Amino acid sequence: MKTKAVRIYGVNDLRLEEFDLPPLKDDEILARVVSDSICMSSHKLAMQGDAHKRVRAPLAQNPAIIGHEFCGEIIEVGSKWANKFKPGMRFAIQPALNYKGTLWAPGYSYPYIGGDATYIIIPNEVMEMDCLFEYKADAFFMGSLSEPVSCIVGAYHAQYHTQPGSYVHEMGIKPGGSLALLASVGPMGLGAIDYAIHGGIKSARIVVTDIDQARLDRAQKLISVESAQKEGIELI
């Protein structure tokens, strides 16, 4: 089967190409990509090329399909995974595989899987690491956004507090506390504000900063002080 994809060959060397996918192996899955959101990490990949830690260098000989926030539909399933996945099933993906201690990830490290493609082959390690998920919602773009949203949620869960005289980490933000979000009016920052307002743990006060007043003004239009007040939160 032919696919059309954007592959990286080196620093700022991105090429939209059409090429043949290899025959499907018994432990692989053929899929169609429907949506892929763009991450600044892909920009970093383009700027660094072979120096990026997730790349299997050299890219000039091993070009990788870019894009790691994607969602789509399964077309064909190898026999190994036929009991778990079916043709027609919608999927989302967790690209941070952590496979055998490596940093390999779809969108950085593989020749036949990435979000900026029409058709892809999902390799065995994605399923082995339980990083391929059935997606049951209607809008594919929401499946693409599951990866960046997981980064936002993970950042909140990684915060911790300690008590005087104790080294025990109390994980997560503090209910009824004060929360500062620095430089947080870009796409991920807006998501962080939204999660702070509507997530399970609510701060009493959220202070948002940025160096660009125009971006702050736009953020205030998208997420108003009044909407936060309805949730019992002072948004500054």
PLM region spans:
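NAD(P)H dinucleotide-binding glycine-rich loop of Rossmann-like/cofactor-binding domains
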Residues: 97-176
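Adenosine-nucleotide cofactor-binding segment
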Residues: 176, 182, 193-236
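Short Gly/aromatic-enriched secondary-structure transition segments
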Residues: 44-52
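Glycine-rich beta-strand-centered segment in the early N-terminal region that forms part
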Residues: 22-37, 51-100, 113-114, 133
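Residues that mark the start of a beta-strand
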Residues: 4, 28-30, 177-179
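Hydrophobic/small residue at the entry helix of a nucleotide-binding pocket
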Residues: 187-188, 215
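Glycine-rich Rossmann-fold phosphate-binding loop(s) that bind the pyrophosphate
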Residues: 77, 148, 183-187
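Extracellular beta-rich ligand/substrate-recognition surface
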Residues: 6-14
